[in-house]
Amino acid sequence: MFFSLIIPVYNRPDEVDELLMSLSQMEYHDVYEIVIIEDGSTIKCQEVLEKYADKLNISYYFKPNSGPGDSRNFGMEKARGNYFIIFDSDCIIPANYLIEVENALKETYVDCFGGPDKALDSFSDIQKAINFAMTSFLTTGGIRGGSEKIGKFQPRSFNMGLSRRAFEVSKGFGNIHPGEDPDLSIRLWELGFETRLIPQAYVYHKRRIDWEKFAIQ
């Protein structure tokens, strides 16, 4: 299985630096690639990528701004792998992440999966509070944190896996935002693909929203 990590970014070089630092410490030793899609940024991350050129297999693409869903599709079209893993740029990836994903897919293969998110001790108080609110069953129902308490699991694109076949058949994310994540899940189900949660495939999600924006959700 050849993984391609798909990471759209918009004006977030500092986040990309933290994300790539975590990927440089991966315990996974098979070949994989990282595809960075710069979505029309005015503050580019190219200098950050140069720091990791001798440590990571990175492909970089700059394109006009068209939003996160279209940028993920662009990255998957350019990628060489047969299984794509999509991250937000504000995620930090545990060293055993790809090992856990590979083991889970070997045991029970699906064409689309999602994983939970957690907060690191180093996150700010507001980031920890928002993370709790987004992942607690008492608030959002635990959907974004990976709860299996309701219906079919709908992966979220901050931490999502998608096979090349499922991408090619579904054409990936639709041209809607927000709402592209559940839209993709529903279309995959209609096409006969299955989705699942991989509890061990969690990421540390350093959410960059504030209380005012969070209250709207």
Question: What are these language model-derived features?
Answer:
Residues F2-S4, E33, D183:
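Cell-envelope/extracellular polymer assembly enzymes that use nucleotide-activated donors
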Residues S22, E38-E47, N65-S66, D88-P94:
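A conserved acidic beta->alpha catalytic loop
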Residues K63-A79, E100, I150, Q154-F158:
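Glycine-rich, basic loop-to-helix element that forms the pyrophosphate-binding segment
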Residues A119, T140-R165, I176-P178, D183, ...:
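A recurrent flexible, glycine/aromatic-enriched loop bordering the glycosyltransferase active site
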